[in-house]
Amino acid sequence: MLTRSPASAAATSPTTTVTVTVTAAATSPRPSRGAAPHGHFHYAPTPSLREAASRIPALSSRRQSATAPATSSTSLPISIQSRHGPAPVASHTSSPVASDPGLGFPPSSRPQRWAGVDVVAQYSPMEPMDYTTGALLSSQAASSSNNQAVARGSIESRPSHIPNTVGPMASHEEQASALASTSEATAAPIPHGPTVAVAVPPTPGVYSAAPQPHPLSHTPQTGTPVKRRNSQGDVTHNQVEAASAGQSGPHSPKRARLAPKIVSRRYEHCPVEDLVVLIAHMLGELIELNDEAAQKVGQRHNLTRFHSRTTPGISVLDYLHRLAKHAYLSPPILLSMVYYIDRLCALYSDFTINTLTVHRFLITAATVAAKGLSDSFLTNTLYARVGGVRVAELNMLELEFLHRVDWKIVPDPDVLVAYYGGLVARCPGYILECPEPEEADDEDEDEELDESDAIGDDDDDIDGEGGEREEETSSSQRDRHAT
């Protein structure tokens, strides 16, 4: 509620034009502040809009500074609330600094300020008031305080220019414009005198164009600056030399091949593991050749008892290692299995070694060779368990194999020697040991013959001397008888 005497309204300047927007309170009467102590109340009528309009220009004239022009047009929206109304309402007031044309603010771009109104205090936001104590000031005190404020200089509650800040997702053009506006706003004339370094905080929301080092990539520097500089130069020079040498130098040589393993010329002395590798290498080449030939021709394989429905998951090398380890296969048995391949293919035209027949052939050939060449062998139950087939199926495979090879399962020893030499020659990682020199054997034989001849001559000499002695003894005996 505005409580001003009519006398103050008469002091209004006739040259000032003020536009006032007043929100009147409820028209219902309300008790005055000076109520009687015994419950007698008198009601003060609400001031009319005409009286309020006559009071506002007087108040606004007192608030204007000495530097303001004589005539101005000011819009003062004021919200008048009742004493027992809701929470304080923010009213829109004009700042004397913002309305000062000397600061360069156009009328349309004046910054907006808000002033809170305490409902309990019942004062007008346009009345002069000491905000430190909360007491109202008289007209003389208000004018003196205004003069002191003008003498000290106006204090702005916000900066004269707010730079346009951009968010983290702004484009490069917006960031560049924000940096330019910030530099223009913070530019100031350089004073004549000693230079003072001032730290200017960065504008929030604007990214700096200079690259910032990563905190994790920063390494502590030790030593004097000169040593640090020299060490950095040395490291950079070394890095450049290493890079140029790597680009211009020859390519690094490939890994050297391992030397071939030397095996004995007699297959009986060859280790089982090496013989398994030799046989697996030969079977791999044979399977690859037969599979490619079948795909080119496009003919369908004639099914045999050795065919599987699908390719087993174990490789030929691993399968051979399993058989040799758990079925106790010796080198002659392994070489006999290779011999059976040629014999079965020669006598059974529908059979070929491929990915579907190799596993069943190997377990069948191992069973037959162990029974035909070894003095001790396992039962078909154990062979079937090692080979991964049923006992009944292994029995059928064994009978089929014996019938196809015409029951001839014992190869000639010279044939096994020939197969062994062929396996070593086909595998690149193995070679046979050098043969023993024959000249040494011939010399030994000649020496033995010479020794035997010398022994024979000695025997002849002994025999001749004995004969002469016998003749002498016989002649002497004759002479005695004659006498």
Swiss-Prot record:
Full protein name: Nuc-1 negative regulatory protein preg
Keyword Transcription regulation: yes
Function: Negative regulator, together with pgov, of the transcriptional activator nuc-1, which controls the expression of phosphorous acquisition enzymes.
Alphabetic keyword roster: Cyclin, Repressor, Transcription, Transcription regulation
A Pfam family matched in the record: Cyclin
Organism the protein comes from: Neurospora crassa (strain ATCC 24698 / 74-OR23-1A / CBS 708.71 / DSM 1257 / FGSC 987)
Family per similarity comment: Belongs to the cyclin family.
Gene Ontology annotations for the cellular component aspect, listed alphabetically: cyclin-dependent protein kinase holoenzyme complex; nucleus
Biased composition (Acidic residues): 435-473
Coiled-coil annotated residue ranges, if any: none
Biased composition (Low complexity): 1-32, 60-80, 176-200
Gene Ontology MF: a single term: cyclin-dependent protein serine/threonine kinase regulator activity
Gene3D superfamilies cross-referenced by the UniProt entry: Cyclin-like
